[in-house]
């Protein structure tokens, strides 16, 4: 049942007048000019190499392994990780960068060896995508940005990448382009905000994921994998 709002404008005009504001509802709102910009200054002068070192140190604290590779060696590096951790089915996001870095021939060879390789399919039902994610041993995705300060990857849900892809498989492998590593959250969200202001269509939910699933009970006993992947590996691709 919908309600009806009566006298809204007169009510808001009265409040504006009492606050000494312009009574016109079309008066523009100006963003404040902050005297201090510590959110930008913190780690803002670090070089890319220094940010990568900070990222690797932070990943040790959040139980996440970082494997560095080149664009040419990225597919073989991923294959080596699967050999090390145990071969199994793979589900990827629908991302053009898998083709850009030459992952598809490696995925084809996995299928010839008898391992299922699927992608989050925008044409399939939600239930079917979730079923495949539940069965996958590996989730392989690309991050949009990575925060060096906290070891956090930033990515969005969209037609080729549902939320369940990041939480249901046991092993979570994130391909990170070195060029997308930023100091901290302010750089990532500011860029996302600017893109929307410039007219880019906003995607679905934005996810901030820091390593594998970590939980702790009241005694602070760490439990890994309760709400998501048991292991996380960041495959850092030097694209610069």
Swiss-Prot record:
InterPro entries: FTHF_cligase-like_sf, LUD_dom, LutC, NagB/RpiA_transferase-like
Pfam families listed in its UniProt record: LUD_dom (PF02589)
Entry-linked Gene3D superfamilies: NagB/RpiA/CoA transferase-like
One GO-annotated biological process of the protein: lactate metabolic process
UniProt similarity note: Belongs to the LutC/YkgG family.
Physiological role: Is involved in L-lactate degradation and allows cells to grow with lactate as the sole carbon source.
Protein name, UniProt field: Lactate utilization protein C
Native species: Bacillus pumilus (strain SAFR-032)
Highest classification ranks of the organism: Bacteria, Bacillati, Bacillota, Bacilli, Bacillales
Chain's gene name: lutC
